[in-house]
């Protein structure tokens, strides 16, 4: 019985130690969520300004540009998956990977070949475990995204997009990431990045209003050449910031759940230890009483 008490005591100590770790990680994630939200808010004006500029050029010009023109036939499509570098974040990475699998299945049903670009070690590990290939990978920047990484991803995607599919290029590009809705809610989202789908269009003039006259210097094509890579980089960087905030929120939620479970384990093992101690004491009392009765009857 004493051995059983020691086992329960050891389990209680182990659960308490685990709770200290998960509680610390929960607090760290809570702090990082605030910083991630601040970075999202700080980048929003720039992203909106770039989007409005691209919207104006795309709306008020009739130029055919490779980044805004729908291809006659889509043969190859790229999927960029934004996962995490670390685990202990609940279903954060698994949800975005599941969403990407559903997207890939849809694209294949349309007769398109798939090329993968992976961001985050969890996505890389997922593909390696299944012995599946990817075009390029980026790791080490999911928790604190850097614009240089977004630019690297954007340059690689634009280069692949302007290359004909017959020469190894792609006809369209999709990104899959977790959008940060709130601390309690993060949703996997799919966005078609190229050909360009302007998210924030230019408002149409009211009845009787005169359409503004836009003059582009130099040519419209040159303006698009300069604006669209910047737009792609800003969209990718926004996806990285959204994903980072979602990762910290998911990790905070997972660590809080782990801390709560540790509390429940401590309560359960404490009750079991008390029951074992009570049983041991009762057994000892019974042995003492039985011994006393035996001595009394032997006289």
From Swiss-Prot:
- One biological process term in Gene Ontology: proton motive force-driven plasma membrane ATP synthesis
Question: In its keyword annotation, does this UniProt entry include Transport?
Answer: yes
Q: Which NCBIfam families match?
A: ATPsyn_F1gamma, PRK05621.1-2
Top-rank taxon, per record = Bacteria
Role: Produces ATP from ADP in the presence of a proton gradient across the membrane. The gamma chain is believed to be important in regulating ATPase activity and the flow of protons through the CF(0) complex.
One GO cellular component this record assigns the protein to is:
plasma membrane
Gene3D superfamilies listed in its UniProt record: 3.40.1380.10, ATP synthase, gamma subunit, helix hairpin domain
Keyword Membrane in annotation: yes
Q: What does the UniProt keyword field contain?
A: ATP synthesis, Cell membrane, CF(1), Hydrogen ion transport, Ion transport, Membrane, Transport
Task: Quote the Pfam families the UniProt record gives.
Answer: ATP-synt (PF00231)
Supply the source organism for this entry.
Clavibacter michiganensis subsp. michiganensis (strain NCPPB 382)
UniProt-annotated location(s)? Cell membrane
Topology class, membrane? Peripheral membrane protein
This chain's protein is named: ATP synthase gamma chain
As one GO molecular function, the record gives: ATP binding
Assembly and interaction partners: F-type ATPases have 2 components, CF(1) - the catalytic core - and CF(0) - the membrane proton channel. CF(1) has five subunits: alpha(3), beta(3), gamma(1), delta(1), epsilon(1). CF(0) has three main subunits: a, b and c.
The record lists the membrane-crossing segments as none
The protein's matches in PANTHER family, at most eight in alphabetical order, are given as: ATP SYNTHASE GAMMA CHAIN, ATP SYNTHASE SUBUNIT GAMMA, MITOCHONDRIAL
So what family is this one in? Belongs to the ATPase gamma chain family.
